[in-house]
């Protein structure tokens, strides 16, 4: 396969069916109406019923969608994609009955990945992460968040974030980087959590932000990780640097982290299996997105469901993500997560599809550019040979896109995908 830029998607994409809820505004385009999308210079210039296509676009090339269903490009808003090694041994431990906390106390968990990540060079981490990203892109993902948090020292956190930036450049995909230095206490700081938080706030975060490597800041607030007070210190440091925050919140217990995050205008609170009504109310008031991570729930064999009905009643937007990581969610299909969100968490199909598009984009602060189709937005959309949009959540991850337009270029046609590879539309 020769390496060259993806072919431009400029032209008229016609004979399409719009997924319900796909449009960024309230344009009255019925989902059963044959639709067209006009792309020029990598952006959507017009979208609507084919019969209403303005004559001024008639000279553009035409792409026959063949009646395909079109959705916005998918958004995976919570991943730990860059790391060294894997943790299959912990899978066996959990099958034998070990809890999340017991695995961590036995030397596994996050610290196990820290050792492997520190031992790997930047190029090695890129080589390991690239096939993972390719699998997600093959699902129709057009934007992705990648966290640090397996370095837990300045040079190693920098290494992870640099790899994340490189992945975005190599694959032509929107990557939002999140600094998760407060993911776990590194072994060399055992018993000195405040000293480590001081390092995170005073040295690591300012340095990485100055290098342009940080788009947002996250903390794991939990009894086996960092306290509310320590979390707030990190949020204050992020606030001083003008960076948005998010939180691993209420996964194993109700720490009150969601309410704290909402006070800082958090983009999202993620996991939230033990989220309280007070946390829900605070998130609603702040406009904070609830990110559901069914892969981790499934892998950990959790039985405490997130409060879906209460979130729904409160009108808190719910996103769905893979939470790809080597320990608790080795998942690489966002469509499978949509299915699991429906079957395990009882989301409706429209909620699940909004969760991997519109609401996921909002969880990354990308709501004006990603997750919905609209005039002036970058051309990020996916064509599917499906009869009904419900099939996106119905199949157990086996449904491959027909065509992916990512960042205004035809990134996939068929099942082939590679960084900067030319694929004929």
From Swiss-Prot:
List cofactor names only.
Zn(2+); Fe(3+)
Q: Which domain of life is it from?
A: Bacteria
Q: What is its EC number?
A: 3.5.2.7
Its subcellular locations are: Cytoplasm
Q: Which GO terms describe its molecular function?
A: imidazolonepropionase activity; iron ion binding; zinc ion binding
Known catalytic reactions: 4-imidazolone-5-propanoate + H2O = N-formimidoyl-L-glutamate
What SUPFAM superfamilies does the database record attribute to this sequence? Composite domain of metallo-dependent hydrolases, Metallo-dependent hydrolases
Where along the chain is Fe(3+) bound? 78, 80, 248, 323
Q: What is the free-text note on the cofactor?
A: Binds 1 zinc or iron ion per subunit.
Q: Provide the binding site for 4-imidazolone-5-propanoate.
A: 87, 150, 183, 251, 328
**Single GO cellular component annotation?**
cytoplasm
Q: Which Gene Ontology BP annotations are present?
A: L-histidine catabolic process to glutamate and formamide; L-histidine catabolic process to glutamate and formate
Keywords (A to Z) from UniProt = Cytoplasm, Histidine metabolism, Hydrolase, Iron, Metal-binding, Zinc
Q: For binding Zn(2+), which residues are annotated in this chain's numbering? A: 78, 80, 248, 323
The record's top EC class is: hydrolase
User: Where along the chain is N-formimidoyl-L-glutamate bound?
Assistant: 150, 325, 327
Annotated pathway, please? Answer: Amino-acid degradation; L-histidine degradation into L-glutamate; N-formimidoyl-L-glutamate from L-histidine: step 3/3
Q: Looking at the Swiss-Prot or TrEMBL record, what is one Pfam family this protein matches? A: Amidohydro_1
Q: What is its main location?
A: cytoplasm
Functionally, this protein is described as follows: Catalyzes the hydrolytic cleavage of the carbon-nitrogen bond in imidazolone-5-propanoate to yield N-formimidoyl-L-glutamate. It is the third step in the universal histidine degradation pathway.
Q: Which family does it belong to?
A: Belongs to the metallo-dependent hydrolases superfamily. HutI family.
The name this protein carries in UniProt is Imidazolonepropionase
Q: Which gene encodes it?
A: hutI
């Amino acid at each position: 396969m020769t390496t060259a830029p993806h072919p431009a998607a400029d032209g008229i994409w016609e004979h399409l069916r719009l997924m319900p809820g796909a449009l960024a505004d309230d344009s009255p385009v019925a989902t059963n109406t044959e639709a067209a999308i006009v792309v020029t210079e990598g952006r959507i210039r017009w979208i609507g019923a084919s019969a209403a296509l303005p004559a001024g676009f008639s000279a553009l090339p035409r792409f026959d969608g063949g009646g395909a269903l079109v959705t916005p490009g998918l958004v995976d808003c919570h991943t730990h994609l860059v790391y060294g090694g894997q943790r299959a041994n912990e899978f066996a431990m959990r099958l034998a009955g070990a809890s999340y906390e017991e695995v961590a106390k036995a030397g596994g968990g996050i610290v196990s990945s820290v050792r492997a990540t520190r031992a790997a060079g930047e190029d090695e981490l890129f080589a390991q992460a690239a096939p993972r990203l390719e699998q997600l892109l093959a699902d129709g993902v057009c934007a992705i968040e990648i966290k640090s948090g397996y370095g837990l020292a300045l040079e190693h956190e920098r290494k992870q974030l640099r790899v994340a930036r490189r992945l975005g450049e190599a694959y032509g995909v929107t990557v939002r980087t999140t600094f998760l230095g407060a993911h776990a206490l590194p072994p060399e700081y055992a018993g000195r959590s405040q000293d480590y938080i001081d390092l995170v706030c005073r040295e690591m975060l300012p340095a990485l932000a100055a290098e342009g490597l940080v788009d947002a800041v996250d903390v794991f607030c939990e009894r086996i990780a960092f306290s509310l007070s320590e979390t707030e210190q990190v949020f204050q440091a992020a606030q001083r640097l003008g960076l948005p925050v998010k939180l691993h919140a209420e996964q194993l217990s109700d720490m009150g982290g969601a309410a704290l995050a909402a006070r800082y205008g958090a983009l999202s609170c993620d996991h939230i299996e033990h989220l309280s009504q007070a946390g829900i109310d605070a998130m609603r008031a702040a406009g904070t997105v609830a990110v559901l991570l069914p892969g981790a729930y499934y892998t950990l064999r959790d039985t405490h469901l997130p409060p879906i009905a209460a979130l729904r009643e409160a009108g808190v937007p719910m996103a769905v993500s893979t939470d790809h990581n080597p320990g608790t969610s080795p998942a690489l299909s966002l469509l499978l997560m949509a299915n699991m969100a429906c079957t395990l968490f009882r989301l409706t199909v429209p909620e699940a599809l909004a969760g991997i598009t519109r609401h996921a984009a909002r969880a990354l602060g990308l709501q004006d550019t990603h997750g919905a189709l609209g005039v002036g937005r970058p051309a990020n959309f996916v064509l599917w040979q499906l009869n009904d949009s419900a099939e996106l959540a119905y199949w157990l991850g086996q449904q491959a896109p027909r065509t992916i337009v990512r960042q205004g270029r035809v990134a996939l046609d068929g099942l082939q995908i590679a960084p900067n590879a030319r694929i004929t539309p």
